[in-house]
Curated annotation (Swiss-Prot):
Full protein name: Nucleolar protein 6
Chief location of this protein within or outside the cell: nucleus
Annotated organism of origin: Xenopus tropicalis (Western clawed frog)
Listed Gene3D superfamilies: 1.10.1410.10, 3.30.70.3030
Coiled coil: none
Protein's job: Part of the small subunit (SSU) processome, first precursor of the small eukaryotic ribosomal subunit. During the assembly of the SSU processome in the nucleolus, many ribosome biogenesis factors, an RNA chaperone and ribosomal proteins associate with the nascent pre-rRNA and work in concert to generate RNA folding, modifications, rearrangements and cleavage as well as targeted degradation of pre-ribosomal RNA by the RNA exosome.
Ranges for region Disordered: 1-46
A single Gene Ontology CC term: small-subunit processome
Cystine connections: none
Record-linked InterPro entries: NOL6/Upt22, Nrap_D1, Nrap_D2, Nrap_D3, Nrap_D4, Nrap_D5, Nrap_D6
Single GO MF annotation: RNA binding
Keyword Acyltransferase: no
């Protein structure tokens, strides 16, 4: 048989980008003479071949030098292992710019320098007369209002200087940005150009004229505009080289005023430089002009470019550790999406912070890059710049603005060495708190000797949607204009030059922080990012900002609270509480007798309670910010829909609580049984619902007799073939350990018979003493209680030992693991212990159960559920909660599921064991032992190896499944599902069909067996709810029943059919199915099953003689096999679809 397959590998990961920062200052651009030639490779001469050096005995045992000793000590004290040091050094080598590339960039800069000097002058015109510009060029600034005083003419630059990270040697790959500061001649500017955006307009016109003369030059592949850090008052010109170096570098041209041109005291944060009458175009006599700190700061940052670069150059001289630390911090920031956009923490800010720590002796010039990184993270983690700002200024000039002045004007304060520029002017309180939070979490990772700190900190990306538990998007940013009006933010809007997003964002976040209160540990937002645009297009408007998304990191215990208790009715704060919460606030009497203001949110189920943060966000934004609910896309709980069944709303956590309560009651009854020959020593449940991780927990059932056939002698019901298959009743397994005693026999077969007697006796006593309906068998007793069926299995702790006994021909007694003994140990020892531990984990992390259920639902929906045990998935999910770095533990099932997909897709299953430290029992030496044992025995171990404190060497839950091929298939599905789902969650304008990733791709399969929904008992559990449902023989919960009959337990015709298929044809094919309501079975032929076999009676099943072969060989009888699929499933199989375009015989 030949297969016709399209091989599709996993999608290529896009290279991460790193935004070079604008480091301020300038040295004249040095023009090196000559061009570098590429080295020609040649074969080395025989004499040049490297050979091992033979050391003399004295050299071999020579004591280490001081440098070597220092390096060894540093490695011992600072790095957990020498590996971490090598990893960091390797990363720095990878991201730093190579000398060859630097020479290419230098050549490109020299040519730009020459071109800029040849741009012609223009005659002087009014600022508003822009007819001299070609029609193909648009001014890269929003000119609102358009009328402004002033004259403009273009004159060649008075200087062109390289500034920023390129000159400092701190720019990193893959996105190399080189900043060119082009200084406007003094003749272009007038004394009052600091007023009313005159300087900003002239700066933009200067850039536009440069762009018009570079646009058609063959040197450039593209000439575009963008805003520097998305600040619309600071457009820059982007130049990229033509040819193979197009992606090597982007040169950013900044226009700045001559040093010292503007009087700095006029630009202090408490000064006004934008007149209200000019901005509103209305007369406003007698109005106090508000300060314009952000506008002033924008001009000052241009003025101080050169000073900042000199400052950083002085700090970086003789300090290689600073350059390394800046590079590492840039990678760290980039992985957390903190380095781009309006109010970002970019590389320039990182370099300035390091220079501040150097000036305060928090670090010194002999420190390595790693030491500096740690100290910087420590400073960020412990210093709140929103409360206690810092300044680098050493001047004692009392006329300079104080830190208090800066705090009055800005949310985050970090003042430059001149004492006039706030380097964090555009940053919000919430964004800085996120940076603090990330720094704290990173230090924990670095201090954890069991974690791979380097990988978690610098190699794992933290996309916004995977970092926060809940995310919502503002789909129509222009609605924030109404927010500014509602909140009366005209003064702030003037300061921000009409940027209503930057104006309103801090106030909106403040309202949300107050409303959500203790429900959130962190509230942050994406950084508004305006796109680059063509020089012939109108400049990017405020509404063109990238989607504004807000993330909530929830407090696990508090975010589902439905009560917001306010102050006492007669207190002074009651009025403020009522004003804040509006009509939602009401007076309530509490159990302690107090009468207080309160807000109560709906929440009858956990599914509904998870939506409380969403209700708060939508209500407060409409009440205080005039943002209607229709403009908010809240994606925090959208995947809950895959955990609902039928018409019932909710994700059924309450059902599991009901089962656990019934189980606890049964446990007490078993403990207290009298007249048992031996006492019960423990009762332990093993069903997934007892650890809150069953995808669809058992429902309480009351069978309707009319839908069944009655076996009166057994007083139980059986399915009626004339009617739809009865509802699936899952037995909840319970292990009942009996005490050890000399009465137990010492033979495994005799023990089984004694256990069978115990099962019968248990049923009799439960019937007699507690009036419970019981159905005993040789291996278990089914107990019908509260509508649930509990399967009680008696266990004796020494039974596995007797099963291992083997008597040799010599009469020696040996102990050897057998399949039967291992299975019994798994069921009666390991599984109860694991269930108990995971039950405790759910109590600690309430999102564990929901995450595990979602993960299992997805695996089953991909038709791979039979290859992964419930316990395997539970342990994978437990790893996300016990080892969450670089994240915090998930507090919502949805974000837990995203991280589950990422873990499966990116973990190195081939070379690493996944260690799940349940109850924190594993210590440092245990990790080393597991790693070493794994490496030494890798070939004999399962492809997916999961180690726990009680299972360090065997990986019990993945011993037989999955196979390497199934795991590889799952990894590909994880990558694609994660990409598609995260794209959906971050793009509210796209498809809102979130079930898309839960629908399996069927094009892979050779045969599809379509099933009759009438005979699928779990049809209501399907991802896509069936339009038509069938009566499954169950009465409603409140229905009265005269005489209870034992329901049909564990009957699923589809599973019976699958078992028959695998037993009969497992040699030829693999069978895939979703047990949760799936109506299709995917069949994949095994290539090995189609190899001709010798003519023997053992090979006859499913085969015929090969007529084409001279020898008597057997080949599969495909037509008969496909026909058998239908015959075996008569009544259950609707059709068999042989997709012969995929295979041929």
């Amino acid at each position: 048989m030949q297969k016709k397959r399209n091989r599709a590998g996993p999608p290529q990961q896009e290279a991460a980008s790193d935004d070079g920062e604008m480091s301020d200052s300038s040295d004249k651009m040095e023009v090196a003479q000559g061009k570098g030639k590429s080295a020609v490779k040649r074969a080395p001469d025989a004499d040049e071949v490297l050979r091992p050096v033979k050391l003399s005995k004295s050299d071999l045992y020579k004591p280490p030098t001081n440098d070597e000793l220092n390096r060894l000590k540093e490695t011992e004290h600072l790095f957990h292992t020498n590996l971490l040091r090598m990893q960091i050094e390797e990363l720095l080598q990878e991201v730093k710019l190579k000398e060859k590339r630097r020479k290419t960039i230098d050549g490109f800069l020299r040519e730009i320098n020459t071109l800029l000097g040849t741009i012609p002058e223009t005659p002087q015109t009014d600022l508003t007369d822009q007819t001299w510009l070609p029609d193909s060029i648009k001014v890269p600034i929003l000119q609102v209002p358009y009328q402004v005083k002033g004259k403009f003419c273009f004159l060649p630059p008075s200087s062109i200087k390289v500034v920023g990270s390129y000159l400092l040697g701190t720019c990193i790959k893959p996105e190399i940005n080189v900043d060119l500061a082009v200084t406007m001649p003094q003749e272009i500017l007038q004394a009052k150009d600091n007023l009313n955006q005159r300087y900003s307009r002239k700066r933009a016109l200067y850039l536009a004229h440069i762009a018009s003369h570079l646009a058609n030059n063959e040197l450039f592949s593209s000439v575009k505009f963008t805003y520097m850090n998305s600040n619309h008052l600071k457009p820059v010109l982007l130049l990229r080289p033509y040819g193979k170096d197009e992606k090597l570098v982007t040169v950013r041209i900044h226009v700045c005023p001559p040093p010292g041109f503007f009087k700095i005291s006029r630009l202090y944060p408490n000064k006004n430089n934008v007149r209200t009458a000019w901005y509103t175009e209305q007369e406003t006599e007698g109005v106090n002009e508000p300060p314009t700190p952000h506008y002033n700061n924008t001009i000052l940052s241009d003025l101080t470019l050169e000073h900042h670069l000199h400052h950083l150059s002085n700090c970086a001289s003789d300090f290689p550790g600073m350059k390394d630390a800046v590079a590492l911090l840039k990678v760290w920031l980039h992985q957390r999406q903190l380095d781009k956009g309006y109010g970002c923490f970019n590389g320039f800010l990182a370099a300035m912070l390091i220079s501040y720590l150097l000036s305060k002796n928090k670090i010194n010039k002999v420190m390595s890059g790693y030491q500096v990184l740690r100290n910087t993270l420590q400073f960020l983690a412990t210093t709140d710049l929103t409360v206690n700002g810092i300044t680098m200024a050493t001047s004692t000039d009392s006329s300079l603005p104080s830190l208090h002045d800066f705090h009055e004007a800005f949310q985050v304060v970090f003042v430059d060495p001149l004492g006039v520029v706030n380097l964090c002017a555009d940053m919000t309180t919430n964004k800085y708190h996120q940076i603090q939070f990330e720094a704290r979490e990173s230090l924990k990772v670095l201090d954890d000797t069991s974690a791979d700190g380097f990988h978690l900190l610098l190699m794992v990306p933290k996309p916004f949607v995977r970092t926060f538990d809940h995310v919502f998007h503002l789909t129509n940013v222009s609605k924030l204009q109404g927010t500014c009006k509602k909140m009366k933010l005209l003064n702030q809007l003037i300061d921000q030059g009409g940027d209503y997003l930057a104006t309103s964002l801090p106030y909106v976040l403040s309202i949300l922080s107050k409303g959500l209160g203790p429900r959130v540990a962190l509230l942050s937002h994406t950084l508004p990012h305006r796109p680059e645009w063509d020089i012939g297009e109108e400049p990017a408007k405020h509404r063109d900002s990238s989607l504004l998304s807000v993330g909530l990191l929830l407090e696990a215990e508090l975010h589902t609270s439905v009560l917001e208790k306010g102050p006492a009715a007669d207190s002074s704060q009651a009025l403020d509480f009522r004003a804040f919460w509006g009509e939602k606030s009401e007076l309530r009497r509490f159990q302690d007798g107090s009468i207080c203001e309160a807000v109560v949110w709906p929440g009858s189920s956990l599914c509904e309670k998870r939506k409380v943060p969403e209700l708060i966000v939508k209500y407060l934004l409409e009440l205080h910010a005039d943002i209607p609910e229709s403009c908010i896309s809240y994606t925090g709980n959208v995947l809950d829909c895959v955990l609902t069944r039928g018409k019932e709303a909710g994700t059924e956590e309450e059902k599991m609580v009901g089962i656990i309560q019934s189980y606890d009651d049964l446990s007490r009854k078993l403990w207290n049984l009298t007249d048992l020959p031996l006492t019960v020593t423990s009762v332990q449940g093993t069903h997934p619902c007892l650890r809150y991780s069953d995808v669809f927990p058992p429902l309480p059932v009351k069978p309707d007799w009319s839908s069944y056939q009655l076996l009166r002698e057994k007083k139980c019901l059986v399915p009626n073939p004339e009617k739809p298959c009865p509802a699936y009743v899952a037995p909840v397994k319970v292990i009942c350990h009996m005490e050890g005693s000399g009465k137990w026999p010492q033979d495994k077969d005799a023990i089984k018979r004694v256990k069978a007697a115990f099962q019968i006796r248990l049923a009799e006593l439960l019937r007699a003493q507690h009036q419970l309906l019981c159905n005993p068998s040789a291996t278990h007793t089914d107990v019908y209680k509260d509508g649930y069926v509990f399967r009680v299995q008696v266990a004796y702790h020494r039974e596995p030992q007797y099963m291992k006994e083997i008597v040799t021909p010599e009469g020696m007694l040996k102990y050897q693991d057998t399949e039967e003994s291992l299975q019994l140990e798994l069921e009666t020892l390991h599984l109860p212990s694991l269930t108990s531990t995971l039950h405790g984990l759910h109590q600690q992390h309430p999102a564990f159960g929901g995450t595990s259920r979602m993960a299992k639902r997805w695996i089953h929906s991909q038709l791979l559920g039979d290859s992964f045990s419930e316990e395997c998935v539970d342990l994978l999910v437990a790893h996300l909660f016990l080892h969450p770095a670089p994240y915090s533990p998930p507090s919502s099932p949805q974000v837990g599921f995203l991280r589950f997909l990422h873990l499966l897709a990116t973990f190195d299953w081939k070379n690493s064991p996944l260690i799940v430290n349940l109850n924190g029992e594993l210590k440092g030496p245990d990790y080393t032992e597991i790693q070493n044992d794994f490496i030494s025995a890798r070939a004999q171990l399962p492809v997916m190896f999961i180690a726990t404190p009680k299972d360090k060497k065997d990986s019990l839950w993945t011993k037989t499944q999955p196979t390497a091929q199934i795991l590889q298939r799952l990894i590909v599905l994880c990558l694609e599902s994660l990409r598609a789902l995260e794209q959906q969650l971050m793009d509210p304008s796209g498809s809102q069909d979130y079930k898309m990733t839960f629908r399996p791709p069927l094009d892979l399969y050779d045969i599809l067996i379509r099933l009759n929904p009438k005979q699928i008992p779990r049809h209501r559990e399907a991802v896509d709810q069936p339009a038509k449902s069938f009566f499954r023989g169950l009465l409603k919960e409140g229905a009265q029943v005269k005489d209870l009959m034992f329901p049909v337990v564990g009957y699923d015709p589809v599973q019976c059919y699958l078992q028959e298929l695998r037993e009969a044809y497992g040699e030829f094919a693999l069978f895939f199915h979703d047990k949760h309501g799936g109506d299709v079975i995917g069949v994949l032929w095994k290539p090995s099953g189609f190899e001709p076999q010798p003519f023997k009676t053992t090979n006859m099943t499913g085969r015929v003689m090969d007529g084409k072969s001279a020898k008597p060989l057997l080949v599969p009888n495909v037509e008969a096999i496909v026909e058998d699929f239908e015959i075996l499933g008569e009544g259950l199989v609707a059709s068999v679809e042989a997709r012969t375009e995929r295979w041929s015989i």
